[in-house]
Amino acid sequence: MKTLIRKFSRTAITVVLVILAFIAIFNAWVYYTESPWTRDARFSADVVAIAPDVSGLITQVNVHNQLVKKGQVLFTIDQPRYQKALEEAQADVAYYQVLAQEKRQEAGRRNRLGVQAMSREEIDQANNVLQTVLHQLAKAQATRDLAKLDLERTVIRAPADGWVTNLNVYTGEFITRGSTAVALVKQNSFYVLAYMEETKLEGVRPGYRAEITPLGSNKVLKGTVDSVAAGVTNASSTRDDKGMATIDSNLEWVRLAQRVPVRIRLDNQQENIWPAGTTATVVVTGKQDRDESQDSFFRKMAHRLREFG
């Protein structure tokens, strides 16, 4: 009898332990697969592609992949050519100003004399000549202003505080108008784009708190969900040349969850030393930050599993 009871007790204990282990593993798996988190996240920032508005030879490069202030000179394009163009335009303006003054006096004199001294045709001709010269003066002034603007834009300045990166221009090179010369990563503009699976969006709302762990680091950054993308492209549906819908074949028992971009605003920009484009793990903790002291062993294990799973 004792042997039977002992055997039954061992069996019962084994069954209970197996059930508890199954429950723990199941809860950890559900937490791992359904809680709002992703390892498909990247640091991003506002990047300005800087291109000159004029063409010419680069005469001076002032910066090399460094932090710059707004208005700081990045590089300079050949100025003498644009200086000469401005001087020529200024000379044209001066010429037409003198000519306009002469024609204005001539037209005024003929208008005062009237038809008693000359024909109406001669009076109208003088007025028409004056209007033509005034029109030419206006064009010359516009050309002068444009030449002045071109000269000013031979000096390319930083549009904002930030880091100059991917600088690929050198002194002596010829650069064309509109060609990207350098990228400027704006300071204090860093954020995280987390690509959440659609099955996890239930726990993601603007204003929710988030934890960001950069790849290869144990440091946890804090942030707030700023926005959730309103839509993503349907890659399985296109249109043919007649406008008819084309739907790709799909296996009914295999459905891959779509990923939706979630923008997360970092709490402290100054602590961010990770370049834009680097990856991270993001966990959305809800309306408040996660209290690690309240986490169970399995919850902590699930958090660690996210880094490797």
Swiss-Prot record:
One of its GO terms (cellular component) is plasma membrane. The chain crosses the membrane at residues 12-32. It is a single-pass membrane protein. The keyword Transmembrane helix applies. InterPro entries: CusB-like_dom_1, CusB_D23, MFP_Efflux_Pump, PHBA_efflux_pump_AaeA, RND_pump_MFP. Keywords: Cell inner membrane, Cell membrane, Membrane, Transmembrane, Transmembrane helix, Transport. Its main location: membrane. GO terms for molecular function: transmembrane transporter activity. Induction: Positively coregulated with aaeB and aaeX by AaeR. It is found in: Cell inner membrane. The keyword Calcium does not apply. It comes from the Bacteria. Belongs to the membrane fusion protein (MFP) (TC 8.A.1) family. HAMAP family: AaeA (MF_01544). Forms an efflux pump with AaeB. This is p-hydroxybenzoic acid efflux pump subunit AaeA. The lineage of its organism: Bacteria, Pseudomonadati, Pseudomonadota, Gammaproteobacteria, Enterobacterales.
